[in-house]
Structure formats: structure tokens, C-alpha cells
């Protein structure tokens, strides 16, 4: 993922989210308004505009307490990348009721330059009926556009959400100098072997998926909600880039860690990516997955790695976001978001092959 969540490992609370009846996304159910309450502090007001209570999933949405992508931050028209990501529960919201959530964008974005920024929020919140954890739909939202004038020095003083230590920066720099993908010091024999196997499988899946995208319009429509020629070329190019990046364990544009030293591996997280550094980290439960599943739309190490590579801008730009997880939610996305959603690529590769 900008975190991949291990849905199957969540138990009764949210396990039903893995498979639920196909329901289109609702574009009018939820309203999100942003206001500035400090130099880099933002308050988001999320309102249920419907006439029935909603049980709204917090994980990897604007309501998540962890450092996921809550908003998009722009300066002079350029997107400021998220430095990291992350965990999960539900919030029940009565009809016309609102919930407020405040967060500091300087904890997850580098705003040290200061000046004028534009902040927006958009995405999808999986929803269930009141007193239920069975996902039945998802509410798309797009907030107002918030203009902020930020003091760079104050922003730089905000504690970062993840511990990217000087030692880690040094390791990362050495890895880039040598064009090393897997950082050997982060692996033991078992995790190194598993990661190398996942890379090989990811390469084969991505190559096969790229061919299928060109040759199977029915399946392309199923997973990406369009057969537009430009969208198809974008998907094929991204899959080919993932295949190239996965094809070697000692050369490439990303740095790959077998283990986490930055504190991003929260409960239920399989792996995560830092797009600003083109860095991928496997979490302990990644190694509980099978190397390559035979079950359609199930999680495995290969498609988790494929998913993570789509988040890296050095692999393909613009890099993918996490708008939705799981087959039913992903195929409910509109085409523009499906083509930019990481899990659509992993599911397409797995579902075809």
C-alpha cells in the first residue's frame, strides 16, 4: 500500500470486506469540507448527507488516525508527495451528522519551503449499514480547495510521522549509488529468498498482464472500466515498467527492504511504499502470504510487490494511489480512478493468471 492491508487477517471485524455484493459508488452520500486551524493543521468535517445511518470504514481514508494520504498538497501547481502511509475500524454517522478530524499535513509532507499551498481531499470511503461490518458500497468524496500560506520553518519543526533516521538516509543513499534494489542488510536468508521469488513472480505476472491488456478488451473493461485507447496504453506502459523493475534484484530505480526500520509496519499492514523516495518495505506478515496464490483475487507476495511498485513514481509517473481495495470495490471505481488505483493492477494480474 501506500499501504497494502491484509484484509484476510483482520478477523470478524472487517473480513467481510474482502468480498461483498457489487454496488456502485455513491457520489452524493458524503461531504468533506477542509478548514485551516493552524500553520499546517487542517480540520476535515465529514458529513453523512443521506437519510440512513452509515458505518464508515476509517482505514486508509481521511478518517484514519495513521499517517495515510488524507489530502493532496500542491505548490505552484506541483504535487507535494506523501512521505509515508498506514490501519483500521469503523465510524458510525447518523443522517446529516458530521464528524471532525484534525491532522497536521507537515507530519506527512515536506513543507519546509513554505509559501502558498493548495490542499484538497478526494477518495472513497467504504460503507456498511448501521451495526454491520459488511461493506455494501463506497462513498466517493471531493472536498473544497483550501488555500494555505505556510511558514516553512514552523512546518520543518513538526515531528515526522515516521522515523527516517540519518542512518536510514545513509543506507538509502548508498543503495541508490549502487542502483541496489534489495538492501541486503535488511534481510535474513529466508526473507531475501522470499523477496527475490516475489520479484520474479511479479515480473512474470506484470508481463502477462500487459499482453492481456492489449489483447483482451473484455477483461480490460472489467478491471479498468474503459477500453479507451489512451487509458489502455497507460496501463500497458505501467505494467511493462513494473515488469522491468521486478526483473532484477540488484539493479533498478527503487530500493527494496525485506524488513522495516522506520516504524511503518503497523498491525495488519503487509508492505508500504514511500513514493517520495521510491522505497518499498515488506512487513512481517508479508511473509505469511503464499508466494503465488492459485485463488482468484486472493493476496500473495507477488501481487503485493506488484501493487507496491505501482506506487513508485520512478517506475511509472504519475504513480498510483489507493482509492480502493479488493475486487468489488476496485471494479466499482470510475475509469479515471481505476486506471490510477494500485489494487486494480494487482487484481488484474492475479485474476487473469
Swiss-Prot record:
One of its GO terms (molecular function) is metalloendopeptidase activity. The active site is at 308. Binds 1 zinc ion per subunit. Zn(2+) binds at residues 307, 311, 322. It is found in: Secreted. GO terms for biological process: proteolysis. Its cofactor is Zn(2+). Its EC number is 3.4.24.39. It catalyses: Preferential cleavage of bonds with hydrophobic residues in P1'. Also 3-Asn-|-Gln-4 and 8-Gly-|-Ser-9 bonds in insulin B chain. Keywords: Cleavage on pair of basic residues, Disulfide bond, Hydrolase, Metal-binding, Metalloprotease, Protease, Secreted, Signal, Virulence, Zinc, Zymogen. It comes from the Eukaryota. Pfam families: Peptidase_M35 (PF02102). Residues 1-19 form the signal peptide. InterPro entries: Fungal_M35_metalloproteases (IPR050414), MetalloPept_cat_dom_sf (IPR024079), Peptidase_M35 (IPR001384). Disulfide bonds join 187-258, 265-283. Residues 20-179 form a propeptide. SUPFAM superfamilies: Metalloproteases ('zincins'), catalytic domain. The keyword Secreted applies. One of its GO terms (cellular component) is extracellular region. Belongs to the peptidase M35 family. Probable secreted metalloprotease that shows high activities on basic nuclear substrates such as histone and protamine. May be involved in virulence. This is Probable neutral protease 2 homolog MCYG_07155. It comes from Arthroderma otae (strain ATCC MYA-4605 / CBS 113480) (Microsporum canis). The lineage of its organism: Eukaryota, Fungi, Dikarya, Ascomycota, Pezizomycotina.
Amino acid at each position: 500500500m501506500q499501504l497494502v492491508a491484509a484484509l484476510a487477517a483482520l478477523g470478524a471485524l472487517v473480513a467481510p470486506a474482502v468480498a461483498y455484493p457489487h454496488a456502485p459508488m455513491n457520489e452524493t452520500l458524503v461531504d468533506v469540507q477542509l478548514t485551516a486551524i493552524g500553520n499546517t493543521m487542517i480540520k476535515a468535517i465529514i458529513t453523512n448527507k443521506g437519510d440512513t445511518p452509515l458505518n464508515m470504514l476509517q482505514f486508509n481514508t481521511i478518517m484514519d488516525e495513521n499517517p495515510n494520504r488524507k489530502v493532496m498538497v500542491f505548490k505552484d501547481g506541483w504535487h507535494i508527495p506523501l512521505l509515508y502511509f498506514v490501519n483500521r475500524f469503523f465510524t458510525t454517522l447518523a443522517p446529516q451528522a458530521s464528524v471532525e478530524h484534525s491532522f497536521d499535513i507537515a507530519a506527512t509532507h515536506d513543507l519546509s519551503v513554505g509559501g502558498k499551498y493548495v490542499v484538497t481531499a478526494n477518495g472513497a470511503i467504504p460503507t456498511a449499514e448501521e451495526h454491520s461490518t459488511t461493506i455494501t458500497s463506497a462513498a466517493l468524496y471531493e472536498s473544497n480547495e483550501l488555500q494555505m500560506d505556510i511558514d516553512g520553518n514552523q512546518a520543518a519543526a513538526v515531528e515526522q510521522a515516521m522515523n527516517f533516521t540519518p542512518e536510514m538516509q545513509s543506507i538509502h543513499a548508498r543503495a541508490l549509488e549502487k542502483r541496489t534494489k534489495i538492501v541486503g542488510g535488511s534481510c535474513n536468508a529466508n526473507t531475501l529468498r522470499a523477496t527475490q521469488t516475489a520479484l520474479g513472480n511479479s515480473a512474470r505476472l506484470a508481463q502477462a498482464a500487459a499482453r492481456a491488456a492489449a489483447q483482451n478488451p473484455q477483461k480490460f473493461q472489467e478491471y479498468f472500466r474503459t477500453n479507451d485507447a489512451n487509458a489502455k496504453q497507460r496501463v500497458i506502459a505501467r505494467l511493462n515498467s513494473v515488469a522491468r523493475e521486478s526483473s532484477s534484484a540488484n539493479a533498478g530505480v527503487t530500493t527494496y527492504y525485506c524488513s522495516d526500520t522506520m516504524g511503518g509496519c503497523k498491525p495488519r499492514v503487509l508492505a508500504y511504499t514511500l513514493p517520495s523516495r521510491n522505497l518499498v518495505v515488506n512487513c512481517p506478515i508479508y511473509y505469511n502470504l503464499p508466494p503465488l496464490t492459485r485463488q482468484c483475487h486472493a493476496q500473495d507476495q507477488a501481487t503485493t510487490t506488484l501493487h507496491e511498485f505501482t506506487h513508485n513514481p520512478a517506475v511509472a509517473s504519475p504513480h498510483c494511489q489507493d482509492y480502493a481495495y479488493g475486487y468489488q470495490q476496485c471494479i466499482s471505481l470510475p475509469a479515471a480512478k481505476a486506471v490510477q488505483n494500485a489494487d486494480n493492477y494487482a487484481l488484474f494480474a492475479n485474476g487473469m493468471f
